[in-house]
């Protein structure tokens, strides 16, 4: 006995739920099969007395993320701004330097040129890469065969710029610079709107959070869909050899549908058996695309003591000894439940996972006390953390990364349907892929691909642009004339070299004219 419907959606994260909602609103009979005992996927809002609510997974939204903002608003959710009123801190070589703005200031002029050149070159290279087809970039092969470590070493002359560039990669994609393709990372930053947009709180990707937590997006769609959402149903088998697609779950339920949307991370396709087998390129692609490593940590305090010292809670922390490289204030908008959120990133997540929860908390508090210069940081009232590396139905967080050589070879199959299976998930997005915004884009696009396949909408309606959010408008990202035209360090050296040669030649000519050069 099988359950019949129009579309089975595999995965009840934001992408799968957004797809299911659109199909349901279009009058189709849809079933969502979710492996876990909850919806939300890589978003997860924990609720208890100590925290009220806390996002242990994806949390941040900001300007230009118009789809998630529209969907959340439709579901009755509101946003609030992450605190960035006071000063940020850059902690480097054991010292804390307060600053304002998205990037830490640099005082050494040579180092400044190096930093400026790195950010500018990242954005310049990104402009060469098509958001919807990075493998079509003019230098795609060359950039894809290079790791971000190689690119950083090539672009940065100073240790200071190399360290900040490395932290930037670790923070953006929860992976090491030697693990990721330069082409893929350049694409990733580009499709988030560039270096400033992706890294910024104000006017950037971390500007806001949802009041009540981001888990509500998926939960409220589940409320709308009712018993069409089936929890604790890991999909193990998809059969496309008959008139309808058959989908089997681990508890041996059968679902029969005209179409399927796979809204899980690409590599989790490995947990499903396919009949007929997947095409060669997809079969290999899903074995080659891992997810990043991160432990998200939230330390709670009696009050936001850092604000009294004119610090907003954002800390950018350099150095191997520091467990956390980046923090943000996670205090509730009302000013209660004071907290600092920090990420343990990439290899540090693997290393520090060996410790106990209590040992990690101790390390974090000691670090925050040092960076903030506040012994109050040693007196937490509560602690929550989530190690996403141990989640068998995510495989890691925030998102899938592409090692060198994979994107140009296999990238084009990411969203390519396999007969009646269509692919969603934030990884398949073309704008803010890796974020909740990308999840919504991908889910709704996959849903419209099916509506088109059923003859309900024309092909040119599959991809739709999104009007700008009226509540969260974007300010343009601007650069100064100097930032655009200052030379790089090698450029400066060449300039000095040319000037020296020119000066020496001119002096020699002058000396010769005045008879000051004696011929031997």
Swiss-Prot record:
Keyword Iron-sulfur tagged: no
User: Per its database record, what is this protein's job?
Assistant: Catalyzes the oxidative deamination of primary and some secondary amines such as neurotransmitters, and exogenous amines including the tertiary amine, neurotoxin 1-methyl-4-phenyl-1,2,3,6-tetrahydropyridine (MPTP), with concomitant reduction of oxygen to hydrogen peroxide and participates in the metabolism of neuroactive and vasoactive amines in the central nervous system and peripheral tissues. Preferentially degrades benzylamine and phenylethylamine.
* Transmembrane segments annotated in the record for this chain: 490-516
What is the protein named? Answer: Amine oxidase [flavin-containing] B
| Pfam family, any one | Amino_oxidase
Quickly give the catalysed reaction: a secondary aliphatic amine + O2 + H2O = a primary amine + an aldehyde + H2O2; (R)-adrenaline + O2 + H2O = (R)-3,4-dihydroxymandelaldehyde + methylamine + H2O2; a primary methyl amine + O2 + H2O = an aldehyde + H2O2 + NH4(+); benzylamine + O2 + H2O = benzaldehyde + H2O2 + NH4(+)
User: Residue positions of the PTM S-8alpha-FAD cysteine?
Assistant: 397
Entry keyword annotation includes Oxidoreductase: yes
Q: Which family does it belong to?
A: Belongs to the flavin monoamine oxidase family.
- Membrane topology annotation: Single-pass type IV membrane protein
For this protein, what is the EC number?
Answer: 1.4.3.21, 1.4.3.4
Q: Which keywords does the record carry? A: Acetylation, FAD, Flavoprotein, Membrane, Mitochondrion, Mitochondrion outer membrane, Oxidoreductase, Transmembrane, Transmembrane helix
In the UniProt record, the signal sequence range is none
Domain of life, per the record? Eukaryota
Q: List required co-factors.
A: FAD
What compartments host this protein? Mitochondrion outer membrane
- In the UniProt record, what gene is named as encoding this protein? MAOB
Q: Which residues carry this modification: N6-acetyllysine?
A: 52
Q: Which residues carry this modification: N-acetylserine?
A: 2
Residue ranges, Cytoplasmic side? 2-489
Molecular function (GO) terms for this protein are:
flavin adenine dinucleotide binding; monoamine oxidase activity; primary methylamine oxidase activity
Q: Please give the InterPro entries that the UniProt record associates with this protein.
A: Amino_oxidase, FAD/NAD-bd_sf, Flavin_amine_oxidase, Flavin_MAO
Organism expressing this protein natively: Pongo abelii (Sumatran orangutan)
Subunit structure, per the record?
Monomer, homo- or heterodimer (containing two subunits of similar size). Each subunit contains a covalently bound flavin. Enzymatically active as monomer.
Question: Which Gene Ontology terms of cellular component type are present?
Answer: mitochondrial outer membrane; mitochondrion
